[in-house]
């Protein structure tokens, strides 16, 4: 229903206020979604762990050539498709897949120019820190291996136990493992 639709920067989103993760929509990512929009023009965009598809919807408005949204939850894929239909009815530039992120990255054949990694928390407490850093390193390495030369990676950590320096080190380690040189364009916050 319309009372479950929220507006952000002129875009509409279905929100599940009762059963959604946290608030049902991550408002702390608003500025980062706008940044994705700015970089998307003419690009093949992959949004991993898409949930509501916020980044995907912004990439579409940013005139991406195509946008693929991936989430392990079929419910999330239904939600991103509903949000696309709300904003870009019938637009064939978007496809969504209910699939494990690592499996999708292994099998993907599309040459992506921009990849967004916004996974759920890998560590909610200090005891899980080592495994979380390993997970972030592995995930980012896989993205670096697959992204086109000159591509842009938006990568996020919402793990409270992982600080900014540890996350940055995981990303740079992933780049080195993949044989890719990287530079930070923006230090994002959420």
Give the role of each language-model region.
Residues 66-71:
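Conserved SAM-binding motif I beta-strand of class I
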Residues 75-116:
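S-adenosyl-L-methionine
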Residues 152-190:
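C-terminal catalytic and target-recognition region of SAM-dependent MTase-like enzymes
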Residues 42-51:
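Conserved class I S-adenosyl-L-methionine
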Residues 147-149:
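Helix-to-beta-strand junctions that scaffold the AdoMet/dcAdoMet cofactor pocket
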Residues 52-65:
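Conserved SAM-binding loop of SAM-dependent methyltransferases across substrates and taxa
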Residues 1-26:
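Non-catalytic substrate-recognition/targeting regions of SAM-dependent transferases
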